Amino acid sequence: ENILLFEIALHFGTFLATIIIFREDILNTIKGFFLGLKDFKNANENDEGFRIAFMVIIASIPVAIVGFFLEKYLSDLPLHRIGLNLIITGSILLLTKNTDKIPIKKDVFSTTYYNVLMIGIAQALAVFPGISRSGMTISVALFLGLNRDFAGRFSFLISLPAIFGALILSLKNLKDLKSFDISYAVIGLITSFVFGIIALKFLMSFLRKGKFFHFGFYCMIVGIAVYLYFITVAVN
């Protein structure tokens, strides 16, 4: 049970780190959403905040559906499958090296809702352990022609509903809080928050410089190591 509480704290720390880093985008999106409720057509065509808010909603639908129906089946995924998923993620990330040749969409309004749905489906695939959520969503966004900065920002904006949903699903499994060691939660929360801030800044910096594909090498190496470890254990 303490492990479950620790996992929840990790999710919450990551959630808070994302909010801090992308607070301006979040505030503009929330503001645009409520203003757009008064005039949907005009806001959808002219208000960037509302447009992004609507895009976030659309992109969140696939992961909500997949997560709801498959969540209980994914916790015991075999180790070699996780290794293979990491290798798949790494391969896709490496392909983003050539996205500079793809015509870039000039602004948010050039991004179609079909594009957004594809990014949402990419996020849904990340319910499978070993598939990187940000890796998949940013990669697909780049393949679809979103500029690097917005691809990263949008990827982490749509992560917020997904992380919040994961928190809710985890909280329902908590039973007697009195039996938990709160120190686990505090350590997990602080650690994930601090490292989340550092990781987000580092990733966005690499992305803006066109070096996002470098993370593909990391995923490939870890994936191969996990798979080889599984083979070694299985043989012995």
Segments predicted by a language model, with ranges:
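Multi-pass membrane proteins that catalyze or facilitate reactions on polyprenyl-/lipid-phosphate substrates
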Residues: 1-236
